[in-house]
Structure formats: C-alpha cells, structure tokens
Amino acid sequence: MKPRHKKLAIIASSVTALGVASVLVLNAFQSNLVFFFSPTQVANNEAPVGKSFRIGGLVEEGSVKRQADGVTVNFLVTDTAKVIPVVYTGILPDLFKEGKGVVAQGKLASDGIFRADEVLAKHDENYMPPEAAGALDQADKARKTVMQ
C-alpha cells in the first residue's frame, strides 16, 4: 500500500470506530435516561405510561396508608394543583413524612397509579429537589392565576 492509501485507511477506520463508539454511548444514555414529571404533568397525560420516570412533589397530609404486609405503602403525591396515587413496596427512607418533599422513580400503570421502585425523601428543612421545587412553584402560579 502506498503511504497515501495507508493514511486514508487509518482515517476511515478512525471515523468508523468513532461512529460505533458514539452509537454505543448514545444507546446507553437513552436506556438509562429517566425524566422528571410533576403530578400536574402526569395528570395531563404528559408522562409515558409503562416507562420509567420520576415524579416529585409533596406527600399529601393524611394519605399514607400501610398495607397488612408491612412493606407496601400507598400515598398521594401533590404539587398543590393535582394529586397522583403512588404504591411502593419496600422500606421508606427515615425522612419520609406527610407534607414533606418526595421524589419517586417508577412506572405509571394504565390505571393511573404510579408504581414506585424507589422513593427518595427530602433530607433537611431547607432542601427540595430542584425539579420538585420548580414544579411546585409552577403549579402554585397556575393555581393563583386561575383563582384571579
């Protein structure tokens, strides 16, 4: 092979390898990407049914109900505008309380119940996940606009 052909072969191989690597990385990102939705967005059918995503807001007061098995918990997540029922089987975080911030990851069933695989609770009095805080602010502004 001439030096010029070798150089072209190396460039072509490099471009092909870079393309394959890019496809693999994008595929990995796509399969691990988890979107965040507020209860209002879920209630407005903006969230995918049967696909994993996160929902965040406040645990509605008086909504936490433990099942007889001791590990399944039903509760409601709200952004002060809409409410979504959540079912979680597992041990809840110590800081999980009614009226406090929560982010749950799982799938929305066709019956409208969010089946959580993981529940994350607010960890101090001043912290709320940015997505949940933004969703609460947006829902509160919308509610105030409607009331005027």
Swiss-Prot record:
The chain crosses the membrane at residues 8-28. Residues 29-148 are periplasmic. This is Cytochrome c-type biogenesis protein CcmE. Keywords: Cell inner membrane, Cell membrane, Cytochrome c-type biogenesis, Heme, Iron, Membrane, Metal-binding, Signal-anchor, Transmembrane, Transmembrane helix. GO terms for molecular function: heme binding; metal ion binding. Its main location: membrane. Belongs to the CcmE/CycJ family. Residues 1-7 are cytoplasmic. It is a single-pass type II membrane protein. The keyword Iron applies. Heme binds at residues 123, 127. Gene3D superfamilies: Nucleic acid-binding proteins. The lineage of its organism: Bacteria, Pseudomonadati, Pseudomonadota, Betaproteobacteria, Nitrosomonadales. One of its GO terms (biological process) is cytochrome complex assembly. It comes from the Bacteria. It holds the Pfam family CcmE. It comes from Nitrosospira multiformis (strain ATCC 25196 / NCIMB 11849 / C 71). Heme chaperone required for the biogenesis of c-type cytochromes. Transiently binds heme delivered by CcmC and transfers the heme to apo-cytochromes in a process facilitated by CcmF and CcmH. It is found in: Cell inner membrane. GO terms for cellular component: plasma membrane. The keyword Iron applies.
